[in-house]
A protein has these predicted regions:
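Residues forming the Rossmann-fold NAD(P)(H) cofactor-binding site
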Residues: 19, 398, 484
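Redox-cofactor binding/interface segments in oxidoreductases and associated redox assembly factors
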Residues: 91, 119, 423, 430, ...
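Glycine-rich phosphate-binding loop at the start of an alpha helix
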Residues: 18-19, 136, 432, 451-454, ...
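Active-site-proximal alpha-helical scaffold in enzymes
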Residues: 204, 484-486
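Short, active-site-adjacent cap segments at secondary-structure transitions
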Residues: 83, 124-125, 427-431, 480-481
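Conserved CoA-thioester-binding segment of acyl-CoA-metabolizing enzymes
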Residues: 365-425, 439, 448, 455, ...
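An acidic, glycine-rich surface segment that forms the CoA-thioester-binding/catalytic face
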Residues: 68, 435-476
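N-terminal glycine-rich phosphate-binding loop for ADP-containing cofactors
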Residues: 1-380, 388-391, 441, 445
Length: 486
């Protein structure tokens, strides 16, 4: 098992995000120093943590004495000197480039040479934040999602000078800390916010143009995307000014399409939440609302992949975990069809003189977008096959078994590969066959599909067992059912 090499974490900032990040590390058994310039703000941050821990006691996630023990490991300080024994320091102050830089200049004076420094920024390039640091190789971005103690997604963003060792060390540890990290390129918006913020903004444009009311747009969006809350309700939850400022930051880098709508700006100026019951504003046009919100999602997700920010599977993973969407952008595209998806994007992007992303051009004529649930890595003469469904505990479904078979046969037939290792990403090796798959097939009365899936699995296991090349399962987490067979 991986060993935790971080024992004391510093969190700079005690607001909503800072206190939640501190809570996350407290719940994982670490000592935490929370630093802020104002002791009253620090006390409020600690009180907020106490409220959430009390809720965890009520839900029987932890016990009362466990809550007290956690709070006993939380230290409040208005001095950067208190960070001197920390092995990891995360900044979570408000989004101001110079303020954040000054925070790290001060922190670097006190921390040891091996301490990892990280920013929770959602807006600024990591390489820009790193400029004043004397050792930028130990600095990177770790972007949490609300609520940081509960939401499992963390985007890890290495800057230009971040060392591979720093990135890999934190990536490994976030799995140990019960998070699901994805490594993304250092661009504004990173991966998830790059398409999520324009999705929110487009909803306000649809309202502005009279295609629906707040209530009707929210309702239709919930139905189409399968969400618990629509874009206006989500902005109320996370803060409408955040959506506006994030839109402005994106527009500064990527162009006018990303600019906040006039309606969004006015709402921020009013200092009021959206009226979620409001049915005023034009006539409902469900087709326009659906097509444009999907087009924003599909188009920008395709830009992300075209630019090498991350791959389609990790983009979908980010949407499912970070935003709690049932399906990610590319899974949605596969569901409604690539041809229709492409037409939606072309229609929207042409209004803004934006080119069709290269990824969508290259996907033309294909039936589906290939989503890699199983990755293959070559390390010298060793082939490593990694199952990448951490949000599903790497449970086996039809696509996973098919891709496992393909990757195994590739290595089996490659004379340069002398041995093959199987491993699972996250906290499980393989938690058996997908229960969801069986329930869906039973509901569809498709027992033949279940039989075919079982046969595919047994064929794969037989090939592995009879392979003349040494095979090994690297167990770093649970293995159940089909995972034990594998």
């Amino acid at each position: 098992m991986r060993k935790n090499s971080f024992d004391k974490v510093g969190v700079i900032g005690s607001g909503t995000m800072g206190s939640a990040i501190a809570q996350h590390f407290l719940m994982k058994g670490l000592e935490v120093v929370m630093v802020d310039i104002n002791l009253e703000t620090l006390k409020r941050g600690k009180a907020t943590i106490g409220v959430f821990l009390s809720e965890a006691v009520e839900r029987r996630v932890i016990k009362e004495d466990g809550k007290n023990e956690m709070l006993g490991r939380l230290h409040l300080s208005a001095s950067y000197e208190s960070l001197k024994n920390c092995s990891l320091v995360i900044e979570a102050v408000f989004e101001d480039l110079e303020v954040k830089r000054q925070v790290f200049i001060e922190a670097e004076k006190w921390v040891g040479p091996k301490c990892v420094l990280a920013s929770n920024t959602s807006s600024f390039p990591i390489s820009e934040l790193a400029k004043p640091l004397s050792d930028p190789s130990r600095f990177l971005g770790v972007h949490y999602f609300y609520h940081a103690a509960k939401n499992k997604l963390v985007e890890i963003i290495p800057g230009r000078e971040t060392s591979d060792e720093t990135t890999e060390k934190l990536y490994e540890h976030y799995f140990l800390w019960d998070k699901i990290p994805i490594i993304v390129k250092d661009v504004p918006g990173f991966a998830v916010n790059r398409f999520f913020v324009p999705w929110l903004n487009e909803a306000s444009r649809l309202l502005e143009e009279g295609f629906g009311s707040i209530a009707s747009i929210d309702q239709l969006t919930r139905e189409v995307f399968g969400l618990g809350a629509g874009p206006f309700a989500l902005m109320n939850m996370t803060g409408i000014p955040i959506a506006m400022h994030a839109s402005k930051t994106l527009s500064d880098h990527f162009g006018e399409f990303y600019s906040p709508s006039a309606t969004l700006k006015r709402q921020v100026e009013s200092r009021n939440d959206w009226d979620l019951e409001s049915r005023r504003s034009g006539n409902l046009n469900g087709e326009v609302i659906t097509d444009r919100l999907m087009a924003v999602t599909f188009g920008i997700a395709s830009q992300i992949v075209s630019e090498g920010v991350c791959d389609p599977w990790e983009t979908d993973l980010g949407a499912r975990i970070g935003l709690r969407w049932p399906l990610g952008p590319f899974e949605l595209m596969n569901r409604i069809g690539l041809s229709r998806s492409k037409k939606m994007v072309e229609s929207l992007f042409s209004r803004w003189d934006m080119p069709l992303p290269d990824f969508l051009k290259e996907a033309s004529g294909k039936k589906n977008i290939l989503l890699d649930q199983v990755h293959a890595h070559r390390i010298g003469e060793t082939g490593v096959i990694e199952i990448c469904r951490p949000d599903q505990m790497n449970a086996l479904d039809v696509l996973t078994v098919d891709q496992l078979s393909e990757r195994f046969l590739e290595f089996q037939d490659d004379p340069g590969i002398k041995r093959i290792i199987f491993m699972g990403r996250g906290k499980a090796f393989v938690a058996g066959a997908s229960v969801k798959f069986f329930l869906e097939r039973i509901e569809a009365d498709d027992y033949q599909g279940i039989d075919l899936f079982t046969q595919k699995g047994q064929t794969l296991f037989k090939r592995i067992a009879e392979s003349k090349k040494p095979t090994m399962a690297y167990l770093d987490g649970m293995a159940l059912g089909g995972g034990l067979e594998l």
